[in-house]
């Protein structure tokens, strides 16, 4: 039959339109069956021919529409592919790695993969970020160019920032030069101003030391009179507190007087030794002077001290010194040997 031939004919159309077309054809078939039952056999060939013609025309129109739609879709798909490829080339590897890590994490957790809408939104976000970064970079370069133009190319470059606080600092090798300049250099042999009060050459001279000691000799008499007064007060007072205070003052004054006498005696020993060495060099018995060591100087001072004392004072001093040395030796002994003695 012509109807069966028309129905069996293959048509080029999309899946959705084909389903719609089959529904329409099925409806028309039902109508045709009803008309066939009601109409006579004479009218059947005319109706069949008309229906076949209509079906053929509809199929041709649908073929043309399908061709146009497929061409448009192919051009649109190629344009979309090119645009996507250009945009994907601009995406950094870091952003792609982050997206891949997030997708892999969600898959490990058992979450469902993102839909097309979500992927599209992520792509849009990446494009937006790239666009903003590009605009910001262009804006910064333009600002720098304008600043350089305004300043005449003499703007100070900003110091480079560190990637982290643990990274080494970058320092310029150009060091700032001081503003002070030596216009005229003074000659090397020019005399410099000096203060004689703090000049070591003046203060350390033996002549100055001798003159100072000679100028303040009255202090020795004053110290001796002070010691005599303290001894008289100590003999008269009976209050224990005052006696303790007077004893302390008397001991301090005597120690100070003894120290000054030792220093004076040491200076006398050194002066006599220098005079003796000078005399020997002058006589030709020596070519170079001999300088006393500290230990030798101490022995000479002690010898002179004992020579200046009387016989009774010397014996007392020697006895005190012997006891002092013995006590110092006992301190070094262990406790067992101390008990035996």
Swiss-Prot record:
Output the Gene Ontology cellular-component terms.
Answer: 90S preribosome; nucleolus
Keyword Metal-binding assigned? no
Family matches, as InterPro entries: RRP36
What broad class describes the main subcellular location of this protein?
nucleus
Instruction: Report which residue ranges the record marks as coiled coil.
Output: 116-150, 241-283
Instruction: Name its GO BP terms in alphabetical order.
Output: maturation of SSU-rRNA from tricistronic rRNA transcript (SSU-rRNA, 5.8S rRNA, LSU-rRNA)
Show the segment(s) annotated as Disordered: 1-216, 232-288, 304-341
Q: Give the top-rank taxon of the lineage listed in the UniProt record for this protein.
A: Eukaryota
Q: Does the keyword Nucleus apply?
A: yes
- Where does this protein have compositionally biased stretches of type Low complexity? 203-215
Where do Basic residues bias regions lie?
155-165, 313-328
- Protein keywords: Coiled coil, Nucleus, Ribonucleoprotein, Ribosome biogenesis, rRNA processing
Where does this polypeptide localize?
Nucleus, Nucleolus
Here the segments flagged for biased composition (Acidic residues) are 17-40, 48-70
Q: Where are the compositionally biased (Basic and acidic residues) regions? A: 109-146, 232-286, 329-341
- Please describe the quaternary structure of this protein: Associates with 90S and pre-40S pre-ribosomal particles.
Q: What is the role of this chain?
A: Component of the 90S pre-ribosome involved in the maturation of rRNAs. Required for early cleavages of the pre-RNAs in the 40S ribosomal subunit maturation pathway.
- Tell me the PANTHER family matching this sequence: RIBOSOMAL RNA PROCESSING PROTEIN 36 HOMOLOG
Q: Which family does it belong to?
A: Belongs to the RRP36 family.
Q: What is this protein called?
A: rRNA biogenesis protein rrp36
Source organism of the structure = Talaromyces stipitatus (strain ATCC 10500 / CBS 375.48 / QM 6759 / NRRL 1006) (Penicillium stipitatum)
| Gene name of this polypeptide | rrp36
